[in-house]
């Protein structure tokens, strides 16, 4: 049987007795990084007399293709990501799909998750959408962020310390009045919360992993971008035309035809 086991996102005490028992009884451990998982088990004084199989985003399909179905049925198998809940911005979903397809029994142990923890800490209320990490750069990033800002639900993102300032600057440009909640180093000693309008956010120390919670937009209100701002975005003409149509009385087709003539 397969058990998906969440691991702490920072504080080692944030793990359940059930999760520890599953790790202790495991015969096969699928994990993102075997070094990280072995270190974690050592911290909990759990013996390493198990088979460890590295399974991450780059080899997930290959590992599943070579799986011994009987092992998953007859042995105690667990999957853990490096931190948090498997399957949420981490591998795990494809392994579940394999179990569903092959009628292999599985279960999921509830536990730590950065997105939900940050949402609760934000004080925002209402429906929310989780978007994981944005594309690193280029028009794909811009397109994704603009769609998120047009969303009429609360949005939750993950961002790395290397790109958090870039994201804040983008939010200042596209939605300066939007309320943003930032959570850094959740559950750790230097846990930090910041809540302010995008235009007022100042980051003094960007080190650490970030969760960004963006208050919902108003679907009847246009993004805080003017015509020239959109023209200067690194987007395909069709996407620009759609955005420009939202702040004008022209159709996307009319604007597109105008743009291709310029």
In which residue ranges do the predicted regions lie?
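Conserved helicase motor
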Residues: 54-61, 134-137
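Glycine/small-residue-rich loop that forms an oxyanion/phosphate-binding "nest" at active or ligand-binding sites
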Residues: 64-117
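Glycine-rich, flexible N-terminal cofactor/catalytic loop recognition
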Residues: 1-57
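A contiguous loop/helix-start segment that scaffolds small-molecule binding in enzyme catalytic cores
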Residues: 2, 51, 76, 154, ...
């Amino acid at each position: 049987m397969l058990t998906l086991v969440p691991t702490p996102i920072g504080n080692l005490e944030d793990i359940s007795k059930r999760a520890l028992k599953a790790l202790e009884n495991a015969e096969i451990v699928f994990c993102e990084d075997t070094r990280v998982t072995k270190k974690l088990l050592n911290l909990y004084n759990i013996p390493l007399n198990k088979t460890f199989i590295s399974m991450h985003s780059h080899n997930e399909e290959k590992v599943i293709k070579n799986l011994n179905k009987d092992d998953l049925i007859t042995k105690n198998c667990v999957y853990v990501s490096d931190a948090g809940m498997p399957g949420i911005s981490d591998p795990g979903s494809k392994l579940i799909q394999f179990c569903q397809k092959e009628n292999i029994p599985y279960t999921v142990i509830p536990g730590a998750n950065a997105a939900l923890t940050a949402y609760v800490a934000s004080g925002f209320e209402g429906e929310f959408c989780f978007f994981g990490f944005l594309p690193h750069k280029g028009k794909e990033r811009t397109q994704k962020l603009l769609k998120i800002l047009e969303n009429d639900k609360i949005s939750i993102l993950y961002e790395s310390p290397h790109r958090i300032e870039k994201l804040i600057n983008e939010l200042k440009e596209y939605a300066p009045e939007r309320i943003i909640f930032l959570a850094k180093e959740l559950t750790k000693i230097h846990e930090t919360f910041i809540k302010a309008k995008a235009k007022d956010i100042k980051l003094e120390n960007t080190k650490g992993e970030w969760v960004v919670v963006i208050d919902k937009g108003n679907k009847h209100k246009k993004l805080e971008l003017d015509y020239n701002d959109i023209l200067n975005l690194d987007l395909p003409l069709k996407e620009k035309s759609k955005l420009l149509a939202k702040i004008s009385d022209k159709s996307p087709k009319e604007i597109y035809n105008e743009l291709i003539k310029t």
